[in-house]
Amino acid sequence: MTLTSAEKEMSGVLTFFQKEIRGFRTGKAHPALVETVTVEVYGTTMRLSDIASISVSDTRQLLISPYDAGNVSAISKGILAANLNLQPIVEGATVRINVPEPTEEYRREVIKQLKRKSEEAKVSIRNIRRTCNDRLKKDDSLTEDAVKGLEKKIQELTDKFCKQIEELAKQKEAELSSI
């Protein structure tokens, strides 16, 4: 495993972490809250983002416009079934969702989940580091000094990505606490 492939894998972990925490409800309307909701339409299960456009009509309200107006009730049912603590309101060919202000208990729970997810991401990054270091030690074509130098660079990458994860988690926690 080269330095660039290690960086690519670590970057993938960071991207996954960003996507995971984007879905945490902070009290502000954001399409990421519902875009992964699955909906039963046309005899199959599809993601909401594949069958409708999701927009923010104001800071606490989402507007979902299905590409096929016949899917409005299925979308409403899908949102309710997702247990997101969101109440869809069907208005003709659209669905509105008023995003409630999170309760203190909900905020504490989300912050706990956020910390768990950030720790899982950091563990994944450290596992990539361990795998790289193990492969370096097994590579007979490298000198001991070369191995030490590469291990140091891999550690620097690990520190960089762990710090980015911590920063994202702090930002999200501040966003949750400031509501």
Swiss-Prot record:
Segments passing through the bilayer? none
Q: Does Membrane show up as a keyword for this record?
A: no
Q: Which domain of life is it from?
A: Bacteria
UniProt cross-references to InterPro entries, sorted A to Z: Ribosome_recyc_fac, Ribosome_recyc_fac_dom, RRF_sf
Signal peptide location: none
Q: Which UniProt keywords apply?
A: Cytoplasm, Protein biosynthesis
**Keyword check for Cytoplasm:** yes
**What main location does UniProt list?**
cytoplasm
Name the CDD domains for this protein: RRF
Q: Which terms in the GO cellular component ontology are assigned? A: cytoplasm
GO BP: translational termination
Q: What would be one Pfam family of this protein?
A: RRF
Matching Gene3D superfamilies, A to Z?
3.30.1360.40, Ribosome-recycling factor
Molecular function (GO) terms listed?
ribosomal large subunit binding
- Location relative to the cell: Cytoplasm
Task: Cite the HAMAP family for this sequence.
Answer: RRF
PANTHER family in UniProt: MITOCHONDRIAL RIBOSOME RECYCLING FACTOR PSEUDO 1, RIBOSOME RECYCLING FACTOR
Q: Which family does the similarity line name?
A: Belongs to the RRF family.
**Annotated function:** Responsible for the release of ribosomes from messenger RNA at the termination of protein biosynthesis. May increase the efficiency of translation by recycling ribosomes from one round of translation to another.
- Return the protein name: Ribosome-recycling factor
Q: What is the lineage of its organism?
A: Bacteria, Pseudomonadati, Chlamydiota, Chlamydiia, Chlamydiales
